[in-house]
Amino acid sequence: MFVSYRWLQEYVDIKDVTAQELADKITKSGIEVEGVEVLNKGVKGVVVGHVLECEKHPEADKLSKCLIDIGEEEPVQIICGAANIAKGLKVPVAKVGAVLPGNFKIKKAKLRGEASHGMVCALQELGIDGKLVSKEYADGIFIFPSDAEVGADALEILNLHDEVLELGLTPNRADCLNMLGVAYEVAAIYGREVKLPAIDLQETAEKTSDYISVSVEAKEENPLYIAKMVKNVKIGPSPMWMQTRLMAAGIRPISNVVDITNYILMEYGQPLHAFDYDKLGSKEIVVRLAKEGEKIETLDDQERTLQSHHLVITNGTKALAVAGVMGGADSEVTNETVNVLIESAYFAGQTVRRTSKDLGLRSESSARFEKGIDPTRTFEAIQHAAALMAKYAGGEALEGVVEADNLQVQERTVSVTAEKVNRVLGTNISASEMGTMFTNLKFPFTEVEGTFHVNVPARRPDITISEDLVEEVGRLYGYDHIPVTLPSGTMTRGKLTAAQTKRRKVRRFLEGAGLYEAITYSLTSADKAKQYMVEPNEKAPVALALPMSEERSQLRLSLVPQLLEAVSYNVARKNDSVALYEVGSIFLPTEEGELPKEEQHLAGVMTGLALHHAWQGEKKVVDFFVVKGVLEGLFDVLGVSNQITYAPAKREGMHPGRTADIVLDGEVIGFIGQLHPEAEKQLDVKNTFVFELSLVKVFGTDAEETYYSAIPRFPSMTRDMAVVVTKETKAGEMKQVIAEAGGELLKDVTLFDLYEGEKMEEGKKSLAFSMNYFDPERTLTDEEVTEAHNRVLTAVEEKFGAELRK
């Protein structure tokens, strides 16, 4: 929001405050002033000149030789290249010695043999942004009104002795998107009164209702619509003071009627629209929702295709404007316009925002409707606009307005105690001081024993709860005046939760095992969202309503797909050995309309070499058992290794013979295995193994306590055993049977060999176990170990039909 310092002085007396001081004060009150721009940019020596004579330069067709009265004893000769220079005009002249933007000094010169004592200026040459210059003067010099005084300071007439404050408004302070809103803010800061604009409206005997009727079909989207007629206007330039104020506000002047609607927009914050009444095609205005596919050509000469939730202003059949966004070209005010219908309305911000976004079309009006306007100013704004059109466009304002009013503005009363204000702010402000602040804010209130009951004006929709009033007091008191204090309260010793401690253990172990932590997107594409799920889920993944792209449109149900993307990316760049893990959330869909269930998972991917250079010079390739070994070590650290088993499994996207479910106390909590060859081919990777498991379920299991014992004084005895079993026999189950059969003396069982070679009978395999027998109190005899070992042999023969391999 650009605020003209001189324009602001019309509403609040701040002549004793400089623009920079005002900017500092506003910033300290909670509204950031991003900058203060001096409009004249160091320009001096520019006056109003009267062109007495103008003829073609004898040596150059595109130059004119002019004799110009600049208010001095003698007129001066100036050579000018502007096409619109002519005798009798009053123009801005930079005299010899004048300074223009960029410290450009005007000197006497000769152009094609003719002396030139100065320079006739375009607005751009005086430092005005070319985008703000009206089309009439965009390619030529500026022309003053005929009543401009010769020799007068041109910058004063152009209002360039002004400074503009740029406010960086947050969305909740839409009340300051207009000059009156800023005036209320400044008046509250300095404790001064707001001078509201005077409206001098003279109406004719004819009535607006004789020319137009208004009906609203979409009452929820448009609770208030007001129309007023102004006849017999004469389209021309708006007065100089209005043009300069609009340019200071960042708006390009167009014509008197259009400029007046923009001026009211900047003054009241109430968007208006002016229709050429004679182009409406009927004597009625109907506000309705658009028909699907309905088309309209807007003022920017673009044809727009509307949707059924867009709000339009129509003549009963044809769309004339996109409500709250932009008018239509068919009813545009042009130089031929004679009769004007003014629109002032209150459109629902959500409707305007959605329409604006759908059409990719934003305007000053839509920005204000989106954030919310003051509905109590709608009538006042249209009356003021009609008065200005009567005065500056020669129009005749017809009596009254036509309106469709379904708006109910409810009073808002918010209460707060003085005790709460001081407690929250850490101040000691008296109740009387707070009352003065509410008075300065123009908030009517009553006070009962230190409790303020504040009636919030409609212009401040951001004030809804007591904390908002606390903020208002804090802003006006000055955040810089709030005393600095140390935190109070009992200091407590912080500690990690059990889950945090376990997550740190997981990270520390996996990084020690050579895996790197990755953090991937929680959003994925529809085709990847349901890949590699730990548990099947028939419900559709949770989709975003407005995704930025299809690649990031749904919440993930597994961590593996995103990790595989990272591995594929690395392998494509010649980083063939990759080991990654991620601790992150998946999002399980629940009942429709409910939030998804968020569950923390651990996933990992390993490919390439597990060991690059052993001391013997060997290299070890990642395989199923390498990855399984990593998980076994992790489960051991977490104290759940004895509760974990593995079961062969078939999962979509996984190798059918090299995949297993991870089972905790009989419940599947994850999986481990190699990618299916087709999946590896799609990702352009080889020998890639993955795992994923639910940390919630692992952490929810009681961990075994860790015990420490002295280094044994007595030796242990080791026996190896190789048995032939069917290929379907699970080594894990056999290991468990061996441990139970060996009794107390058997301390450790390790599978050290699996053989399925040519020497084995079809359908058979060999499993070799190493068993360690030990008693901490004595040395075992060979007979004791043999007895325990024989029990083991008997158990595996009976349970699995195993045959001792010789």
UniProtKB/Swiss-Prot annotation:
It catalyses: tRNA(Phe) + L-phenylalanine + ATP = L-phenylalanyl-tRNA(Phe) + AMP + diphosphate + H(+). It comes from the Bacteria. One of its GO terms (biological process) is phenylalanyl-tRNA aminoacylation. One of its GO terms (molecular function) is transferase activity. Its cofactor is Mg(2+). Gene3D superfamilies: 3.30.56.10, Bira Bifunctional Protein, Domain 2 (3.30.930.10), Ferrodoxin-fold anticodon-binding domain (3.30.70.380), Nucleic acid-binding proteins (2.40.50.140), Phenylalanyl-trna Synthetase, Chain B, domain 3 (3.50.40.10). Its main location: cytoplasm. This is Phenylalanine--tRNA ligase beta subunit. The gene is pheT.
